[in-house]
Amino acid sequence: MKEKLMRCIIERILKEYKEGKTLDKKRIEQIKSECLRIYRIGIGHPSNSEILKYATEEEKKILIPILRKKPVRTISGVAVVAVMTSPAKCPHGKCIFCPGGLDSVFGDVPQSYTGREPATMRGLMFNFDPYLQTRARIEQLEKVGHPTDKIELIIMGGTFPAREIEYQDWFIKRCLDAMNERESKSLEEAQKINETAKHRCVALCIETRPDYCSEKEINQMLKLGATRVELGVQSIYNEILKLCKRGHSVEDTIKATQLLKDSGLKVSYHLMPGMPGSSIEMDKKMFKEIFTNPDFMPDMVKIYPCLVIEGTELYEMWKRGEFKPYREEEAIEVISYAKSIMPKWVRTSRIQRDIPATVIVDGVKKSNLGELVYKYMEKKGLRCRCIRCREVGHVYYKKGILPDPEHIKLVREDYEASGGTEIFLSFEDVKNDILIAFLRLRDPYKPFRKEIDDKTMLVRQLHVFGWEKALTRDIKEVSWQHMGYGRMLMKEAERIAKEEFGKKKILVTSGIGVREYYRKLGYKRVGAYMGKEL
């Protein structure tokens, strides 16, 4: 009887699809109800992943994009897999706002987490085993119809470079083993296998503190295969950093930013408006400084308003009436301002932490703060031109607009940052302001890596957006990843490096699983990079 129910749902969806009817979430649920009334089985609405089990391979090609949950998960062309390291002490002590850690009110959980976040719960469930966490997340994404051939691996759980080198190597190796679906003898072997694996690690992100980002830590991160480093900057005011016991200075942030960029890595800042000692005006000034002062200018930002959580020093201050976090409308005002002045080469990767409202004592409890910011900006006539707001998948998802091929042009923006010259190359629909692909090219300032000399130009990032989505009538590919934009951007980067900067060599910081792509463009391994003589 259950099989008949599932076939009923599948056949009705396919029939309406062929008739060109709208198949949104509401209509899918109605179809489930209609079939349940026919077969009168005493179960609730079957999940989409359960329905897919009863579909043929041909049917799945149509059903998966229609039933796919949370399309934003792979809207940028890659599937994100976040893996949590085991709980360990923070290298510098504890910030006043930081929950979690060993012996916290939440038990032994990773530093700065509560144990209630999805990634932390997955970590706890698998005893922080990197292999099991990675496998479980990939399987979870596949069940709800997401492609998992391109994986962005994010290592969460505190200052990863502060852990023992042996732990770091083992942890990344086990994540790669899970993607490779086989055991390897060493990190190097796991990386080599992953270059052509079914689930390729196309990006690896590591979180650290500005004072744990010296040449030594950067060398280790590059050895692991890192392509992006997220810095816990929080504030650029030393008095606030000191008050909050951050244990690092703004000078550490400036130095770490320069070293990372000159090593070809992407730089993401974690920023926390509303910290003790700050104000709305100070936070607005901070964002303006970060986006205009060449000492900073990160490639990406995550914005988390300061929250009061039990078990922290900040909680005790709050109880004594010494601190009051931002109200929702204050946080929206500050973040909207930040987004309205954000340069087109910055990407907003997250607004608001993944902490459940139940553990937030005071502060912004809405998990959809980003949506509220978006609505506020629309109402005020403000516009954000960051990468995320302009990328092809997000524009289609939010506005239903696709790029017009006649208006797709190569666009270039040069700017000075961290002592060097940055060139942001992109293919854009200039009429509709839609971003299709981009490349970050850098003439470094003071590189320390032996592979990089004064005749070397760096490609810090190449990204072509891709996404599939079921449209009302047809399954259309909103995917730009196989139209040659990547090759054209690389060709232009090589031309600029040779003709305009007189360079003899170009190096690319390539994800492990993208090395084969660069080999096809004539690149070969040069230390931690893929390189080519010009």
Swiss-Prot record:
It holds the Pfam family Acetyltransf_1. GO terms for biological process: tRNA acetylation; tRNA wobble base 5-methoxycarbonylmethyl-2-thiouridinylation; tRNA wobble uridine modification. Changing Q461A: Strongly reduced tRNA acetyl-coA hydrolase activity. GO terms for molecular function: 4 iron, 4 sulfur cluster binding; metal ion binding; S-adenosyl-L-methionine binding; tRNA binding; tRNA uridine(34) acetyltransferase activity. Keywords: 4Fe-4S, Acyltransferase, Disulfide bond, Iron, Iron-sulfur, Metal-binding, RNA-binding, S-adenosyl-L-methionine, Transferase, tRNA processing, tRNA-binding. It comes from the Archaea. Acetyl-CoA binds at K150, Q461, L462, H463, V464, Y485, G486, R487, Y518. Binds 1 [4Fe-4S] cluster. The cluster is coordinated with 3 cysteines and an exchangeable S-adenosyl-L-methionine. Residues 73-344 form the Radical SAM core domain. Residues 70-330 are annotated as: Radical S-adenosyl-L-methionine (rSAM). Disulfide bonds join C384-C389. The keyword Oxidoreductase does not apply. Pathway: tRNA modification. Its cofactor is [4Fe-4S] cluster. [4Fe-4S] cluster binds at C90, C95, C98. The keyword Translocase does not apply. tRNA uridine(34) acetyltransferase, which mediates formation of carboxymethyluridine in the wobble base at position 34 in tRNAs. The proposed mechanism is the following: (i) recruits S-adenosyl-L-methionine and cleaves it to generate a 5'-deoxyadenosine radical (5'-dA) in the radical S-adenosyl-L-methionine (rSAM) region, (ii) hydrolyzes acetyl-CoA in the N-acetyltransferase domain and (iii) an acetyl radical is formed by the products of the two domains and (iv) is transferred onto the C5 position of uridine(34) in the bound tRNA molecule. This is tRNA uridine(34) acetyltransferase. It comes from Methanocaldococcus infernus (strain DSM 11812 / JCM 15783 / ME).
